[in-house]
Regions:
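Asp-based phosphoryl-transfer active-site loop
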Residues: 5-21, 225
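Residue-level signal for inorganic ion chemistry
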Residues: 35, 70, 151, 225, ...
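Short, structured coil segments at secondary-structure junctions
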Residues: 60-62, 69-70, 78, 171-173, ...
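Conserved acidic, metal-coordinating active-site core of Asp-based
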Residues: 102-215, 219-227, 236
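Active-site phosphate-binding/coordination module
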Residues: 21-125
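Asp-based, Mg2+/Mn2+-dependent phosphohydrolase catalytic module
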Residues: 227, 231, 235-268
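Short active-site oxyanion
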Residues: 39-43, 62-64, 150, 210-211, ...
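Phosphate- and divalent-cation-binding pockets in alpha/beta enzyme and binding domains
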Residues: 52-55, 162, 197, 223-224, ...
């Protein structure tokens, strides 16, 4: 029996597990290896796509399926299959036509499991694809096979707020809308978010939700942090996250995950 048998630790990537240069510190790496050697299950919950996540697997110590696409999919990279998913599907078409008509010039991305598409591009969307190192192509919506996993709207902050308000007015309850950055608005199936996916992962692994520990810093981590009583945030977390009063950890540049594992270790 290991110290951490029956525990699932689920962390956000950027701003939480990774440094500002998008690497994992030796301190976090050593702590995670110890955590898993003592029976703990560790994975991440990220807005990244399946291809965008794959290159991290070379150096991230993960021993459980991964929550990707901000909670639309739980993917087992070892088995090569999704173990749970709530894709956006054809409902994204209505949203596309409204945004294209009323807010022309807005960047719109959508995804199959392995491929990224730009339905409409702008400087923000082009910069996004460059940053995440994903190949993409500009296409019409009819060229993207169904089901779409999710959509991402990319626009200046003030205009994006107007788009969000208009979508909520036109399509009440049809989508889960969530900022992942001030210029990024995620559009998901209404049952898709990091928290729902985290609980689905617990069920898949046979781990009680009482033993789920989550860590995140951004607005797209709110459901991840409210789905369990064991929620933590690094000191650099956004104000909306800090307002939830999760337990606070050091800044993500100061090895927040290692600090959490040390806390769990001391309690056992």
């Amino acid at each position: 029996m290991g110290k951490f048998d029956g525990i699932l630790l689920l962390s956000d990537l950027d701003g939480t597990l990774l440094s500002g240069t998008r690497v994992i510190s030796p301190e976090n790496l050593e702590a995670l290896r110890y955590f898993m050697a003592e029976g703990g299950r560790f994975s991440v919950a990220t807005g990244r796509s399946k291809p965008g996540m794959e290159h991290f697997l070379e150096y991230l110590p993960i021993n459980a399926p991964v929550v990707i696409y901000n909670g639309a999919v739980v993917y087992d990279f070892e088995a090569g299959r999704a173990v749970w998913q709530r894709p956006l599907g054809e409902r994204g078409l209505d949203l596309y036509h409204l945004v294209q008509t009323e807010f022309p010039g807005t960047g719109m991305e959508t995804y199959e499991m392995d491929i990224a598409y730009a339905l409409s591009d702008n400087p923000i969307s082009r910069r996004h694809f460059t940053n995440v190192k994903m190949p993409w192509k500009l296409v019409g919506p009819e060229e993207v096979p169904q089901p779409w996993v999710d959509m991402l709207l990319l626009e200046q902050e003030d205009r994006l707020a107007k788009i969000k308000a208009r979508l909520e007015e036109q399509f009440p309850g049809k989508f889960f809308l969530q900022y992942s950055d001030k210029e990024f608005l995620e559009v998901l199936h209404p049952e898709a978010n990091k928290g729902t996916a985290a609980l689905a992962l617990c069920e898949y692994l046979g781990i009680s939700s009482e033993n789920l520990y989550t860590v995140g810093d951004g607005r797209n981590d709110i459901q991840l942090l409210t789905c369990t009583k064991n929620a933590y945030a690094p000191a650099n977390a956004e104000p909306e996250v800090k307002a939830l009063c999760p337990r606070m950890l050091p800044h993500h540049e100061d090895h927040a995950i290692a600090a959490l594992i040390a806390e769990l270790d001391a309690a056992r």
